[in-house]
């Protein structure tokens, strides 16, 4: 019997054990992938080419509104559930609530830190949140101080790294992701952390709450993995591999069974939770730049992706083909989102503009 304790193991021996464990893990992953490939008697792309007609390339959205008001790079935007309002965050130090119908500013909220990276609208429309390099998630109540500046209602401090993404569960709870490789669930009323989700090995860049089951959410990180989390259990229940570089964006499909990701490897990918595997890849040899943001149409047939080359590219989800590009920004498309009714797409850019697109 080996009586050697872990404390007696030399650093070299420990490193050798770690490398051996990694090799075994990679071998097991390859075996699992081969087994899944054996069971897959067809592909989504093959089925779609047999049963779905191609989407006409001349039926692309056009710019209907341009929202001007920010004075620096826009890093994030998020639609309200009322389909009319949206919030945007810029490094000019402002959080702006917009009326997308009229292009008017409803609120212009000065931020304590201009290094903002994310923002979110509560489903009720009562609150917005933001955060960034200050490591803090700041909550603002839109129903207070209507005649004066909107002030911080709550500051949620607990992350050891920058805040990369935040999404409200309801008016009482919010999820955040961070460069400290964790996600957290917070109680907004008390300002306390309820659950910490730790399993990634790189900065967590994006999260998306399941639209049909608020007990689960997904995350994408710089370890190139996407994970499905059970909020009640406080742990990851599925891990999805396929990307070859950082995952910058992740978004659930409206049905809650699938999700899309966007990565620095210049591809978007479709994963299915029930099949526990990747179903499609969206990319081409001519696309070399990374993806900053992703969203799907309400039907799930179209995938919108923001790229570093100033374009929002549109993909046919089932056939895996590029339908076209939405061109109009003069710098990186940093964020985008589809309104709840599916009629409008909003894109935000480093050119300081937001554009509303529709048919």
From Swiss-Prot:
Residue ranges with Basic and acidic residues bias: 21-36
Database matches in SUPFAM superfamilies: WD40 repeat-like
Keyword Ligase: no
CDD domains found in the cross-reference section: WD40
WD repeats by residue range: 69-99, 111-141, 158-187, 199-230, 242-272, 286-316, 328-358
Region of interest (Disordered), residue spans: 1-36
Assembly behavior: G proteins are composed of 3 units, alpha, beta and gamma.
Name of the protein this chain belongs to: Guanine nucleotide-binding protein subunit beta
Species for this entry: Cryphonectria parasitica (Chestnut blight fungus)
């Amino acid at each position: 019997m080996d009586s050697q304790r872990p404390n007696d193991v030399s650093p070299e021996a420990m490193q050798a054990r770690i490398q051996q464990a990694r090799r075994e893990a990679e071998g097991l992953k390859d075996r699992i992938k081969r087994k899944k490939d054996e069971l897959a008697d067809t592909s989504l792309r093959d089925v779609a080419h047999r049963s779905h007609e191609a989407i006409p390339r001349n039926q692309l959205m056009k710019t209907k509104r341009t929202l001007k008001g920010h004075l620096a790079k826009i890093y994030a935007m998020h639609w309200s559930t009322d389909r009319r309002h949206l919030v945007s965050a810029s490094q000019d130090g402002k959080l702006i609530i917009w009326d997308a119908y009229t292009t008017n500013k409803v609120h212009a909220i000065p931020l304590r830190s201009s290094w903002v990276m994310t923002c979110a609208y509560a489903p009720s429309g009562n609150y917005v949140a933001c955060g960034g390099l200050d490591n803090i998630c700041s909550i603002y109540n839109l129903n207070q101080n209507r005649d004066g500046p909107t002030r911080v209602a709550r500051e949620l401090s607990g992350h050891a790294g920058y805040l990369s993404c935040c999404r409200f569960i309801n008016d009482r709870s919010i999820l955040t992701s961070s460069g400290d490789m964790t996600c957290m669930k917070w109680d907004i009323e008390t300002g306390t952390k309820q659950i910490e989700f730790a399993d990634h090995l790189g900065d967590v860049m994006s999260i998306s709450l399941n639209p049909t089951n608020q007990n689960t959410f997904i995350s994408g990180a710089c370890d190139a993995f996407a994970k499905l989390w059970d909020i009640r259990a406080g742990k990851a229940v599925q891990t999805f591999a396929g990307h070859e570089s950082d995952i910058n964006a992740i978004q659930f499909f409206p049905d809650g069974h699938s999700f899309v990701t966007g990565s620095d490897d210049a591809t978007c990918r479709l994963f299915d939770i029930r099949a526990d595997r990747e179903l499609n890849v969206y990319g081409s040899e001519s696309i070399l730049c990374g993806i900053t943001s992703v969203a799907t149409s309400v039907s799930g047939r179209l995938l919108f992706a923001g790229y570093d080359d100033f374009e929002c590219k549109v993909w046919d989800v089932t056939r895996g083909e590029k339908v076209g590009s939405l061109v109009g920004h003069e710098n990186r498309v940093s964020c985008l989102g589809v309104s709840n009714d599916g009629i409008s797409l909003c894109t935000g850019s480093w050119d300081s503009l937001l554009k509303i697109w529709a048919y």
